[in-house]
Amino acid sequence: MNNLIMLVTNAVTLSEAAGGLFDFNATLPLQALQFILLTVLLTFIFYKPIGKLLEERETFISNNLAEASAKLLKADELCEQYETQLKEAKTGAQDVIAKAESEAKGIVAQEITQARADAASLIAQTNKELEAQKKLALQQLETQIDELSQLIKEKLLGKVVL
């Protein structure tokens, strides 16, 4: 290792002495070796860990996106199911309401029919009572007329007439 450092320092001093930017002497292969060594070191120390991190992050993001899209699909399915159930519930409720309305109309019609029948029987009974009272009143009037005519006869004739 010390030999390598000495070679590098010697090469640097030689290149300074020559004064050229690219001297094609021993420094060029040394610089190429340094570049390759730097590239290998950076690859293992820097690029591979960062590449792993980027790959892990990309995997994490893609997994989260896949999971989110799966959950979104499931949510859409649940939403469709709930909408279907809601439509069925509304239809069922409308059926129940229609049935209740028809039952209520039937009950009202039955009550009206019953009330009319009760009213008709009450009218018939009242008519019978009125007829009975009329007959009674006529009988009482006839009795009173007979009594009055008897009184008139007695007053006119002066005695009791049978």
UniProtKB/Swiss-Prot annotation:
This chain belongs to the protein called: ATP synthase subunit b', chloroplastic
InterPro entries for this protein: ATP_synth_b (IPR034679), ATP_synth_B-like_membr_sf (IPR028987), ATP_synth_b/b'su_bac/chlpt (IPR002146), ATP_synth_F0_bsu_bac (IPR005864), ATP_synthase_B_chain (IPR050059)
Its family?
Belongs to the ATPase B chain family.
What is noted besides the main data?
In plastids the F-type ATPase is also known as CF(1)CF(0).
Q: Which CDD domains match?
A: ATP-synt_Fo_b
Tell me any Pfam family this protein matches: ATP-synt_B
Q: Which residues cross the membrane?
A: 26-46
Q: HAMAP family, alphabetically?
A: ATP_synth_b_bprime, ATP_synth_bprime
One GO CC annotation = proton-transporting ATP synthase complex
Q: Name one GO molecular function term.
A: proton-transporting ATP synthase activity, rotational mechanism
